[in-house]
Amino acid sequence: MLYEFKGLRPYVHEKAFVHPQANVTGNVEIYENVYIGPGAVLRGDWGKIVIEAGANVQENCVIHMFPGTTVMIEEGAHLGHGCIVHGASIGKNVLIGMNAVIMDDAQIGENSIIGALSFVKAEMVIPNRKVVAGNPAKIIKDVSDEMISWKTNGTELYQKLPNVCHTHLKKTTSLKSPKNQVNEEIISYTTWKKTN
């Protein structure tokens, strides 16, 4: 759902997908092939949010800021289920793990990976290609070329999802009884741990 706030209205590219159960308010720009999942809240009431092309904001993520701040989610960034980004900048092709929290004025360098449940403190600057994890978050190693390839392949699934949702997602009613259903499109993508 899109909401105007004091004359500020969201922009959503026609090739992006914002789930009807997401909440996008005010000064928010959402570009091509962006997926915004159900339960996501993007509050551009006090500042601005920019979601660049090919990024995704998954289910139950929250993006907000202190007044006058711009939150940048750069091209190809991947915000996992339930993460919170408050007044931070997320670089190109970054992966933010599920339920991670990224605080004000933190800067996440491109091709970095933030582990699930991590807490990135305010003003922390993470260089490009770093794996970060923990509470408080610490840099634990460099991101390999193989990790970047794995992350990029996963994000490509989400970059195709807006078109799929526009074409195939529709409200329905429950089946009267369970039946064996198979998605004809088998996707061979798995966790990093299982690939190594």
What are these regions (language model features)?
Residues 7, 12-65:
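A positional/architectural concept
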Residues 1-11, 45, 53, 59-61, ...:
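Glycine-rich hexapeptide-repeat left-handed beta-helix
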